[in-house]
């Protein structure tokens, strides 16, 4: 199930940069090694790329992570992901780094204060 939450009226939403299907396909294939998205992934990514606030409720293992990882490579700015599971943070950041996305990081309670400061400084 996919639910869209549109807080900003569409007429007032900032214009999303034009991202064509070829760019999306290139990121999917080159960075993530996949040939195609699942239908609901495609729908979620299209909504995000169009600048819509989007909430995706999908089954475990469906590939929700790609729904924010792909747009993060195509849109300007910083992507913030909030997760209650430190192990999941580790897995996702390590997976992104292995794929060459080296600006991925995490902030959580397992880090020493100096590590947090260093990572926050790198984000700025």
Predicted regions and their residues:
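Conserved P-loop/Walker A NTP-binding site and adjacent catalytic elements of P-loop NTPases
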Residues: 39-124
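Long, low-complexity, Ser/Thr- and acidic/proline-rich intrinsically disordered regions
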Residues: 1-8
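Conserved pre-motif I regulatory segment
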Residues: 8-9, 13-59
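Short amphipathic alpha-helical segments, especially helix-boundary/capping motifs
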Residues: 3, 17-22, 29, 67-70, ...
């Amino acid at each position: 199930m996919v639910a869209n939450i549109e807080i900003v009226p569409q007429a007032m939403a900032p214009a999303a940069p034009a991202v064509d299907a070829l760019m999306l396909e290139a990121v999917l294939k080159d960075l993530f090694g996949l040939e195609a998205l699942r239908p609901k992934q495609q729908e979620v990514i299209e909504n995000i790329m169009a600048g819509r606030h989007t909430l995706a409720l999908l089954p475990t293992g469906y590939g929700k992570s790609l729904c924010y990882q792909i747009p993060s490579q195509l849109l300007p700015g910083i992507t913030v992901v909030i997760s209650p599971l430190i192990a999941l943070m580790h897995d996702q950041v390590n997976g992104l780094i292995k794929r060459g996305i080296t600006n991925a990081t995490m902030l959580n309670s397992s880090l020493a204060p100096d590590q947090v400061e260093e990572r926050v400084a790198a984000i700025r």
